[in-house]
């Protein structure tokens, strides 16, 4: 009896929560096509280096760039990386690192070139450094990829919130 009652109660609560949320003015960030289309119309210009390439790739995925639409905005950015030794062995060799990636970005109007929005996204990740050279390089590159993904996600959320505010 209890096993069949729990799913029914959960389904009822879920069904009742929709009207309650909409009556308080809640709308999902991506509930409007304005945000999705606005993000898809942003052209990302890659920064220099491997980190710049990784951030651009992640931003292209996150913004879902529509190549069939002329861009309304261009996103330009710079990437700064700092690496700190966090775990040190007895022989004074680092075996754990912290990677701090800062992405300073500017959103420009595609027609006028005027800056319409700017911001900064910071991502901090850690990774182990193995004794084997290949494993150490692979770990560092994985850390870069994770930091680029996190920074791109923060930029995407900032842009989506800005677009949603403009649509309201």
Predicted regions and their residues:
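Short, solvent-exposed mixed-charge patches
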Residues: 166-168
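Sec-exported extracytoplasmic/periplasmic mature domains
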Residues: 60, 64, 152, 156-164
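Post-signal-peptide N-terminal segment of Sec-exported extracytoplasmic proteins
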Residues: 45-75
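Bacterial Sec signal peptide processing site at the extreme N-terminus
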Residues: 17-42
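Sec-dependent bacterial lipoprotein signal peptides
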Residues: 1-24
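Acidic/histidine-rich, surface-exposed loop or edge segments in extracytoplasmic proteins
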Residues: 36-47, 132-135
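Surface-exposed short loop/turn segments
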Residues: 66-72, 76-120, 125-142, 146, ...
